[in-house]
C-alpha cells in the first residue's frame, strides 16, 4: 500500500483504469491560478464526472482522523460539487475510490460519504 498521498493517487488512477478501461483520470495539481480545495483526482467514467479528495492513512492513524484532515476549503469544494449534482468525496485508498466510483455510477452524489453535508458539525472536520 502506498504511504504518501502521491502514491495513493497513482494507485487510484491505475485501479480505475483497470476496472473501467475506457475511463479517463486526471491528477489535479494545485497552483496559484487554481481555486483552493479542488479535489485531487477527477475521473470520467461511463460519462460521469467524479471528484476524489485523497488522504493517505499514516501508520497508526485512525480512518476518522485521516478523514478529519480534509481542510475547510476542500470540504467547501466537495459540497459545491454535490450541490451541482456532481459526485465527490474523500477517500483513503484505491478500494474506497473504486467503491465511490461504483456508487456514483449508480446515481449517488456520494453525500453519505465523508465529508458529511449536514449534522451537528455542519460536515466539516469530523467523519461519520
Where are these regions (language model features)?
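Catalytic phosphate/metal-binding cores of nucleic-acid and nucleotide-processing enzymes, i.e., regions
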Residues: 1-128
Amino acid at each position: 500500500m502506498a504511504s504518501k498521498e502521491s502514491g495513493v493517487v497513482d494507485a487510484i488512477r491505475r485501479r480505475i483504469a483497470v476496472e473501467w478501461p475506457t475511463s479517463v483520470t486526471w491528477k489535479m495539481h494545485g497552483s496559484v491560478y487554481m481555486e483552493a480545495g479542488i479535489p485531487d483526482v477527477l475521473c470520467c467514467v461511463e460519462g460521469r464526472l467524479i471528484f476524489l479528495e485523497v488522504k493517505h492513512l499514516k501508520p497508526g492513524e485512525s480512518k476518522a482522523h485521516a478523514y478529519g484532515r480534509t481542510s475547510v476549503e476542500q470540504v467547501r469544494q466537495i459540497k459545491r460539487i454535490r450541490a451541482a449534482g456532481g459526485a465527490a468525496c474523500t477517500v483513503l485508498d484505491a478500494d474506497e475510490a473504486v467503491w465511490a466510483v461504483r456508487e456514483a455510477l449508480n446515481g449517488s452524489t456520494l453525500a453519505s460519504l465523508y465529508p458529511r453535508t449536514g449534522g451537528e458539525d455542519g460536515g466539516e472536520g469530523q467523519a461519520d
